[in-house]
Amino acid sequence: MHCVLAVGGIHLGHCLRDDHDVTAKTWFHYGKAIERLKFYLSRWKVAKPDDLLRLLISTVLLQDFEAIRGNVDGEVFQHLRASRQIASALFNSTLNNDTEIMGVALEAYCYRELISAFRLGVEEADIQQVLNSFVIDLSCLQHLPTFGSCFWYCSFLFMQIPLISQLAGRRQRELREGVDMCCDVEYTHLYNKISSWRPPGQEFSANCEVDIEDSEAVSAMIVRISLLLFLVTSFYHKSITPHELCKITQPWVTEALSLLQFAHGSPTIIALFWPMIVIGSYAREVSDQSVLQRMLSTSTHKMPIVAKGLVLLECLWRS
């Protein structure tokens, strides 16, 4: 309950900036949640499956708290690390995992775990944790009645994120040490998998790659573009000039912004925050930057993380 109240409070507090009572109560509940969580985490190995589920829900909610707040001190990753063994133990437990709450908790954890690798410089130990867990094969969760609440039908794309992060680390070692690590082969393999992916059941014409009336399909294609941008950067980072990289990525930026016009205002737009930040970091045309600036500044999702994302992009655009 303390976790729920803290999450509600941090969102409300951003809308009511001068309400010190809301802020004080929010941090009171957050402090209590952390206090209780530390106590139960020290005993999680002997916890029953029902208690493991409560622990996982608590850590996921605290990740939400820090994410909404803007992940100011990187605390999302601390809560994520606390979730890993609990989620794995819960997944392998005898608890009936067909229940809705179980499905939502496990999928929410997997979503955050995969999204956390959507960046350069991820620690190798964190990548290996994901690659050696059930998270890397989301098909094991597809029997759950709630599956798709976080991933829609593009779980395949999300599963490529840690593989790209792993390639990024290996590619930097390859460039630094001058030893062939077959990164070009892995890059080509990932590029072909991601670029050829399309939303299931979509009818394509010569002029349109996706049904613009299907907001989930449009959003999935935007996620696909953000992964291609991430992949290209992971491979070419420090081996070509920024200008050369932008020449490669500009067609994808143009396509993504076109699709964002159709996704803007749809229920799936909230899940496109990180893809929008990734796409925005490659936007070099003032007109493209203006489109993203308008979308983020007029977003109906009034949260600190959205405001901080826009500030980050504006800093990149000025540099």
Locate each region found by the language model.
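Start-of-helix signal in alpha-solenoid helical-repeat scaffolds, especially tetratricopeptide repeats
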Residues: H2, L56, M102-G103, E107, ...
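Hydrophobic/aromatic-rich effector regions of fungal transcription factors
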Residues: C3-V22, F28-D73, S83-A89, E107-A117, ...
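Cytosolic regulatory protein-protein interaction regions
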Residues: L16-V22, G121-S297, H301, L313
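Short acidic-hydrophobic sequence patches enriched in Asp/Glu that either
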Residues: D21-K25, H29, E75-A82, I101, ...
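Acidic/serine-rich, low-complexity amphipathic helices located in mid- to C-terminal regulatory regions
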Residues: V60-G169
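Acidic, Ser/Thr-rich low-complexity linear motifs
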Residues: T94-I101, S215, A307-L312
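C-terminal, low-complexity intrinsically disordered regions in eukaryotic proteins
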Residues: T300-S319
